[in-house]
């Protein structure tokens, strides 16, 4: 399978929108080489799927971060109507956090300028019957006042295989999540803690 993947000259049809990327080698982690992939946000298609989140949780399982977004039943004590689960590898979480901390207009600064504080994430109870799950490899987040927005994208191993040579990447828009800015900032803080806790498990 690996040999076949390496011989593919172009991105396969159906992998997603092909965008130009800048590949920058980075310092190795755990003895393994790694690189950052950067692209212009304006070149990324906006996901068609939309989800309005009232709350968020963070989990970890089998080497993956689980970002959970929930819609609460109105008039209840946080009982969930629906739940959206986004699964990301730790290396992709690290890429997102690096981007947040090094951005020209840092997320924390943008939130603080509106007087919004990071919210503590609640303790997760149980999944509602209406639960869906997606994979993601890229996160794009933004805030404006009290409102936050997170776009998730996925690039398959097939798409990533040729990136270093072609300087192009096929990205599949997964879902856009609308969430409070304070809740988004609280999630970012917890993701940083998760990375520190599991830093020895990052494989690339």
Regions inferred by a protein language model and the residue ranges of each:
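Positively charged, low-complexity terminal tracts
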Residues: 2-204
